[in-house]
Regions:
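Active-site microenvironment for binding and transforming phosphate-containing groups
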Residues: 1-267
Length: 267
């Protein structure tokens, strides 16, 4: 299992081998038309970018990955453990019209629906069941991680589409790593309250502070939900400011990364 880097001209994005049966990507900063602090592949619609730039960025990425901009479905991310089932009727939500629902996970079993979640240090998790032909996407900030959003997305796929956890493949994308995610005690306390002693493997004390491994914590949740095929990116968004946006590093003066997954049509 591994993440792969794809380059087409100036465009760069990542994919995971475990999701090869679905069109998907984890974006980087490279290959768009946005300028300044948003240079260049900004995919966020509320970052102060020109709408035509954002649309062109989606079009460029979509041509390479295999989705159309109008197929995307966004959500209002609120650092929750809420997951919503969506379908073709929801396509365009967020890009062509406002995303109304405050949830942090999306699932579907309909081809032509490009589930889209945003990050700039938070953990993006993409899910694919090639047997039941269903997909999921979860945005896991530290609060969502503590609340088990990744496991909740797996449970939604079981409930809505009859997926078996052992058939679900998961890719945990680039986010702030344990090298850079320094926190006060509230973050590790929340993880231990949710995961017990198992959380300890992802928490490193450093004096009065702590360094926390969000990717490992989300992998723990996925394994608890019954998922065994888990691919984890080695990239830290805060360590690579030229390649990824990091809220921890630059605050609000930044663009947004996106993780996108779409079922391909059969046949």
């Amino acid at each position: 299992m591994s993440f792969r880097v794809h380059r087409e001209g100036e465009l760069e994005y990542l994919t995971s081998d475990v999701l090869d049966g679905a069109a998907h990507c984890f974006s980087t900063r490279f290959g768009g038309v946005s300028e300044g602090a948003l240079a260049s592949l900004n995919l966020g619609t509320h970052r102060g970018d020109r709408p035509e730039n954002v649309l062109e960025n989606y079009a460029s990425l979509g041509r390479a990955v295999g989705f159309a901009p109008e197929e995307t479905v966004f959500t209002k991310q609120v650092h929750s453990a809420l997951v919503e089932r969506v379908g073709r009727a929801d396509c365009g939500r967020g890009l062509q019209r406002e995303a109304e629902h405050g949830v942090d996970g999306l699932v579907t079993n309909e081809p032509g629906v490009a589930l889209t979640i945003f990050s700039a240090d938070c953990t993006p998790v993409l899910l694919f069941d090639p047997i039941a032909r269903a997909i999921g996407a979860a945005h896991a900030g530290w609060r969502g991680t503590a609340a088990g959003i990744a496991a909740r997305a797996v449970e939604a796929m079981q409930r809505e589409f009859g997926c078996r956890p052992e058939n679900i493949r998961a890719a945990v994308g680039p986010c702030i790593g344990p090298c850079c995610f320094e926190t006060d005690a509230d973050v590790p306390d929340a993880m231990r309250a949710a995961l017990g002693s198992e959380a300890g493997q992802a928490i490193r004390p450093a004096g009065a502070k702590f360094y926390v491994d969000l990717k490992r914590l989300n992998a723990i949740w996925l394994r608890r939900a019954g998922v065994t095929c888990i691919d984890i990116s080695a990239d830290c968004t805060a360590c690579q400011p030229q390649r990824f946006w990091s809220h921890r590093r630059v605050g609000n003066a930044r663009g947004s990364l996106a993780a996108i997954i779409r079922l391909r049509e059969e046949g």
